[in-house]
């Protein structure tokens, strides 16, 4: 059995692979001591680590482990998952949406980091808490799914009420820009959270398609743990990517790209 671990700032992603198959598991980074104890209590053919807390795990193991650069590991694992899921694209931007978001260009041979932005799961959870007092990510994203952004976000269609707009009416003109026009409305926690997910998704997409245009590719691949239990984020990102004329790809188990890639870089 080989094990690959991507120890991030919020979550630890674990992939185990053998001739019998592959398994995926997630642990909170606050439980890193449990992961270390589990590794020390079992025997593995190899232990491959990546992510910001990889060093913490490695220095507490009773056996040797190999640490790989997170970006290279994610690129390797993503390439495998793309092929396994039938996506045969040679070059693309990939956005790794974790606590924050890192953007990379893959040219068919290697990845190059081309940018990043502080919006991601951390903003959803942090700003989401400030607006709703909900600390649990799953409860927060569950509530966001039922929200309506129309009374909070100002869209192009709200500005061009009686005339044909020069750009698609569903585009957001100003996130949270419709609030002062609707002060007589009860802004429910669900609507607030939906708008938080909306701004996160739109900022990530805008950054991703900007670097896609700069690198002359129409393909944008989205991975990361922020999509866990968050179909609204996926919907916002995919719809906005298409609306801007690019091709979005969402990869199942994409959050485990780093852990999987670390195994195969070893």
Swiss-Prot record:
Its main location: cytoplasm. It comes from the Bacteria. GO terms for molecular function: ATP binding; pantothenate kinase activity. One of its GO terms (biological process) is coenzyme A biosynthetic process. One of its GO terms (cellular component) is cytosol. The active site is at 70 (proton acceptor). It is an enzyme of class 2 (transferase). ATP binds at residues 6-13, 99, 121-125, 137, 225. Disulfide bonds: none annotated. It catalyses: (R)-pantothenate + ATP = (R)-4'-phosphopantothenate + ADP + H(+). Its EC number is 2.7.1.33. It is found in: Cytoplasm. The keyword Disulfide bond does not apply. PANTHER family: 4'-PHOSPHOPANTETHEINE PHOSPHATASE, PANTOTHENATE KINASE. NCBIfam families: panK_eukar (TIGR00555), PRK13317.1 (NF009842). Catalyzes the phosphorylation of pantothenate (Pan), the first step in CoA biosynthesis. This is Type II pantothenate kinase. It comes from Staphylococcus haemolyticus (strain JCSC1435). The lineage of its organism: Bacteria, Bacillati, Bacillota, Bacilli, Bacillales. The gene is coaW.
């Amino acid at each position: 059995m080989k094990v690959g671990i991507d120890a991030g700032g919020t979550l630890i992603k674990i992939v185990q692979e053998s001739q019998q198959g592959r398994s995926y598991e997630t642990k909170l980074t606050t439980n890193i001591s449990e992961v270390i104890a589990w590794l020390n209590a079992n025997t593995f053919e190899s232990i491959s680590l990546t992510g910001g807390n990889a060093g913490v795990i490695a220095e507490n193991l009773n056996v040797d482990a190999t640490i790989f650069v997170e970006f290279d590991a994610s690129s390797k694992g993503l390439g495998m998952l793309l092929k396994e899921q039938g996506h045969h694209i040679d070059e693309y931007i990939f956005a790794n949406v974790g606590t924050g978001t890192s953007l990379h260009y893959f040219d068919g041979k290697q990845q190059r980091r081309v940018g990043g932005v502080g919006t991601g799961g951390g903003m959803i959870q942090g700003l989401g808490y400030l607006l709703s007092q909900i600390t649990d990510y799953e409860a927060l994203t569950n509530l966001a799914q039922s929200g309506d952004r129309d009374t909070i976000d100002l869209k192009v269609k709200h500005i061009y009420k009686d005339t044909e707009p020069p750009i698609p009416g569903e585009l957001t003109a100003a996130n949270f820009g419709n609030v002062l026009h609707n002060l007589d409305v009860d802004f429910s926690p669900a609507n607030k959270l939906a708008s938080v997910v909306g701004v996160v998704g739109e900022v990530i997409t805008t950054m991703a398609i900007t670097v896609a245009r700069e690198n002359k590719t129409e393909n944008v691949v989205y991975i990361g743990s922020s999509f866990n239990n968050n179909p609204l984020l996926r919907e916002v990102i995919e719809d906005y990517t298409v609306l801007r004329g690019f091709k979005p790809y969402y990869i199942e188990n994409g959050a485990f790209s780093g852990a999987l890639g670390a195994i195969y870089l070893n």
